Amino acid sequence: LWYAEIKYGTGVVPRVEDRKWGHMKVIVVDVQKGITDARLYNYEGFLVRMKRLLTAARQSNVEVIYVKHDDGPGSGFSVGDEDFEIADALAPMEGEKIFIKEYNSCFSNKKFEAYLEECEENTLIVVGLQSDFCINATILSAFDREYRIIVPKGCNTTFDNDYMDGATTYRFYNEYVWPDRFAQCISVEDTIHLMLGQRRLAI
Protein backbone atom coordinates (compact mmCIF):
# COMPACT_ATOMS: atom_id res chain seq x y z
CA LEU A 1 0.00 0.00 0.00
CA TRP A 2 1.72 3.16 -1.19
CA TYR A 3 -0.88 5.64 -0.03
CA ALA A 4 -3.37 5.64 2.82
CA GLU A 5 -5.66 8.64 2.91
CA ILE A 6 -6.13 10.57 6.11
CA LYS A 7 -8.13 13.69 6.77
CA TYR A 8 -5.97 16.77 7.16
CA GLY A 9 -8.07 19.86 7.75
CA THR A 10 -10.46 20.02 4.83
CA GLY A 11 -8.27 18.03 2.47
CA VAL A 12 -6.80 14.56 2.14
CA VAL A 13 -3.07 13.86 2.13
CA PRO A 14 -1.05 10.63 1.87
CA ARG A 15 0.49 9.16 4.98
CA VAL A 16 4.19 8.76 4.37
CA GLU A 17 4.47 6.07 7.06
CA ASP A 18 2.31 3.77 4.92
CA ARG A 19 4.81 3.65 2.08
CA LYS A 20 6.65 0.36 1.80
CA TRP A 21 10.05 -0.06 3.42
CA GLY A 22 12.95 -1.01 1.20
CA HIS A 23 16.72 -0.98 1.09
CA MET A 24 18.24 2.32 2.15
CA LYS A 25 20.78 4.83 0.96
CA VAL A 26 22.13 7.86 2.80
CA ILE A 27 22.11 11.04 0.71
CA VAL A 28 24.57 13.64 2.05
CA VAL A 29 23.73 17.04 0.61
CA ASP A 30 26.05 20.06 0.21
CA VAL A 31 28.36 19.59 3.21
CA GLN A 32 30.93 21.79 1.49
CA LYS A 33 33.69 23.88 3.03
CA GLY A 34 32.16 27.22 2.10
CA ILE A 35 29.03 26.66 4.19
CA THR A 36 29.88 23.93 6.72
CA ASP A 37 30.98 26.12 9.61
CA ALA A 38 30.03 27.65 12.96
CA ARG A 39 27.49 30.03 11.39
CA LEU A 40 25.11 27.09 11.16
CA TYR A 41 22.49 26.47 13.83
CA ASN A 42 23.75 23.87 16.36
CA TYR A 43 26.87 23.32 14.29
CA GLU A 44 28.78 21.15 16.77
CA GLY A 45 25.76 18.96 17.47
CA PHE A 46 25.20 18.61 13.73
CA LEU A 47 28.76 17.34 13.23
CA VAL A 48 28.49 14.85 16.10
CA ARG A 49 25.22 13.39 14.81
CA MET A 50 26.41 13.29 11.22
CA LYS A 51 29.61 11.44 12.10
CA ARG A 52 27.69 8.92 14.17
CA LEU A 53 25.15 8.33 11.41
CA LEU A 54 27.75 7.98 8.64
CA THR A 55 29.84 5.57 10.71
CA ALA A 56 26.77 3.41 11.39
CA ALA A 57 25.75 3.46 7.72
CA ARG A 58 29.16 2.27 6.58
CA GLN A 59 29.27 -0.42 9.23
CA SER A 60 25.81 -1.58 8.11
CA ASN A 61 26.74 -1.62 4.41
CA VAL A 62 24.24 1.14 3.69
CA GLU A 63 25.56 3.09 0.72
CA VAL A 64 26.50 6.71 1.38
CA ILE A 65 26.12 9.08 -1.59
CA TYR A 66 27.39 12.66 -1.60
CA VAL A 67 25.92 15.51 -3.63
CA LYS A 68 27.71 18.85 -4.07
CA HIS A 69 26.23 22.16 -5.22
CA ASP A 70 27.90 24.15 -8.02
CA ASP A 71 26.98 27.85 -8.28
CA GLY A 72 28.89 28.22 -11.54
CA PRO A 73 32.28 29.56 -12.68
CA GLY A 74 33.36 32.75 -10.95
CA SER A 75 31.01 32.28 -8.00
CA GLY A 76 33.73 31.03 -5.66
CA PHE A 77 31.58 27.95 -5.10
CA SER A 78 32.32 25.87 -8.18
CA VAL A 79 34.63 23.13 -9.43
CA GLY A 80 38.21 24.08 -8.57
CA ASP A 81 37.28 26.39 -5.67
CA GLU A 82 38.30 25.46 -2.13
CA ASP A 83 34.83 26.30 -0.78
CA PHE A 84 33.33 23.82 -3.26
CA GLU A 85 35.13 20.85 -1.69
CA ILE A 86 33.50 18.62 0.92
CA ALA A 87 34.27 19.58 4.53
CA ASP A 88 37.10 17.53 5.98
CA ALA A 89 35.07 16.54 9.05
CA LEU A 90 32.46 14.80 6.87
CA ALA A 91 34.64 13.64 4.00
CA PRO A 92 33.58 10.64 1.90
CA MET A 93 35.36 7.32 2.11
CA GLU A 94 37.28 6.05 -0.88
CA GLY A 95 34.92 4.79 -3.56
CA GLU A 96 31.80 6.57 -2.33
CA LYS A 97 29.88 8.25 -5.13
CA ILE A 98 29.81 12.04 -5.51
CA PHE A 99 27.33 13.81 -7.77
CA ILE A 100 27.28 17.51 -8.67
CA LYS A 101 24.09 19.53 -9.02
CA GLU A 102 23.39 23.07 -10.22
CA TYR A 103 19.90 23.44 -8.74
CA ASN A 104 18.50 22.87 -5.26
CA SER A 105 17.15 19.35 -5.65
CA CYS A 106 19.58 16.45 -5.91
CA PHE A 107 17.21 15.02 -8.50
CA SER A 108 18.13 17.86 -10.87
CA ASN A 109 21.20 15.73 -11.64
CA LYS A 110 19.74 13.11 -13.95
CA LYS A 111 22.67 10.74 -13.39
CA PHE A 112 21.87 10.78 -9.67
CA GLU A 113 18.23 10.03 -10.39
CA ALA A 114 19.09 7.27 -12.85
CA TYR A 115 21.50 5.66 -10.39
CA LEU A 116 18.82 5.42 -7.70
CA GLU A 117 16.38 3.94 -10.20
CA GLU A 118 18.99 1.42 -11.31
CA CYS A 119 19.62 0.34 -7.72
CA GLU A 120 15.88 -0.03 -7.08
CA GLU A 121 16.17 1.51 -3.63
CA ASN A 122 13.05 3.11 -2.21
CA THR A 123 14.14 4.47 1.17
CA LEU A 124 16.38 7.53 1.32
CA ILE A 125 17.97 8.94 4.47
CA VAL A 126 18.45 12.63 3.64
CA VAL A 127 21.00 14.67 5.61
CA GLY A 128 23.15 17.77 5.19
CA LEU A 129 22.61 21.39 4.17
CA GLN A 130 20.56 23.54 4.12
CA SER A 131 17.23 22.69 5.73
CA ASP A 132 15.34 25.46 3.93
CA PHE A 133 16.94 25.08 0.50
CA CYS A 134 18.51 21.92 -0.91
CA ILE A 135 17.34 19.54 1.83
CA ASN A 136 13.74 20.67 1.48
CA ALA A 137 13.88 20.57 -2.33
CA THR A 138 15.40 17.09 -2.32
CA ILE A 139 12.83 15.73 0.14
CA LEU A 140 9.92 17.07 -1.90
CA SER A 141 11.42 15.75 -5.15
CA ALA A 142 11.99 12.33 -3.58
CA PHE A 143 8.44 12.27 -2.24
CA ASP A 144 7.04 13.05 -5.70
CA ARG A 145 8.98 10.03 -6.99
CA GLU A 146 7.40 7.79 -4.33
CA TYR A 147 10.50 7.28 -2.22
CA ARG A 148 10.16 6.74 1.48
CA ILE A 149 12.22 9.45 3.18
CA ILE A 150 13.84 9.42 6.60
CA VAL A 151 15.15 12.64 8.15
CA PRO A 152 17.31 11.91 11.23
CA LYS A 153 16.91 14.61 13.85
CA GLY A 154 19.80 17.04 14.04
CA CYS A 155 21.36 15.85 10.78
CA ASN A 156 20.34 18.91 8.79
CA THR A 157 20.74 22.57 9.65
CA THR A 158 20.88 26.07 8.21
CA PHE A 159 21.80 29.72 8.80
CA ASP A 160 19.88 32.68 10.16
CA ASN A 161 17.96 34.55 7.45
CA ASP A 162 16.11 37.86 7.22
CA TYR A 163 12.89 36.32 8.58
CA MET A 164 13.87 33.55 11.01
CA ASP A 165 16.95 32.50 12.90
CA GLY A 166 18.51 29.13 12.13
CA ALA A 167 16.86 27.42 15.10
CA THR A 168 13.37 28.54 14.08
CA THR A 169 13.96 27.62 10.45
CA TYR A 170 15.19 24.17 11.49
CA ARG A 171 12.12 23.61 13.66
CA PHE A 172 9.74 24.89 10.98
CA TYR A 173 10.83 22.22 8.50
CA ASN A 174 11.71 19.35 10.85
CA GLU A 175 8.73 19.71 13.16
CA TYR A 176 6.03 21.22 10.95
CA VAL A 177 6.56 20.87 7.18
CA TRP A 178 8.08 17.40 6.74
CA PRO A 179 6.83 15.05 9.50
CA ASP A 180 4.21 12.49 8.40
CA ARG A 181 3.33 14.35 5.21
CA PHE A 182 6.65 14.15 3.33
CA ALA A 183 9.10 12.28 5.57
CA GLN A 184 9.57 10.42 8.80
CA CYS A 185 11.58 12.64 11.13
CA ILE A 186 13.05 10.26 13.68
CA SER A 187 16.02 10.16 16.03
CA VAL A 188 19.51 9.22 14.93
CA GLU A 189 19.24 6.21 17.24
CA ASP A 190 16.08 4.97 15.52
CA THR A 191 17.63 5.55 12.10
CA ILE A 192 20.68 3.50 13.06
CA HIS A 193 18.39 0.75 14.36
CA LEU A 194 16.69 0.61 10.96
CA MET A 195 20.04 0.43 9.17
CA LEU A 196 21.21 -2.39 11.42
CA GLY A 197 17.97 -4.21 10.62
CA GLN A 198 18.75 -3.90 6.92
CA ARG A 199 22.18 -5.42 7.50
CA ARG A 200 20.67 -8.40 9.30
CA LEU A 201 18.25 -8.95 6.43
CA ALA A 202 21.13 -8.88 3.94
CA ILE A 203 23.19 -11.52 5.74
Where are these regions (language model features)?
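Active-site-adjacent betaalpha module
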Residues: 4-8, 17-25, 52-60, 77-203
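Glycine-rich, proline-tolerant flexible connector loops at the mouths of alpha/beta enzymes
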Residues: 73-75
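Short, well-ordered beta-to-alpha junction loops that form the rim of enzyme active sites
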Residues: 69-70, 129
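Short acidic, Gly/Ser-rich segments with clustered Asp/Glu that frequently serve as metal-coordination loops
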Residues: 34-37
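Short beta-strand segments at enzyme active-site cores
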Residues: 28-29, 63-69, 152
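A short alpha/beta connector and helix-capping loop motif
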Residues: 39-57, 61-66
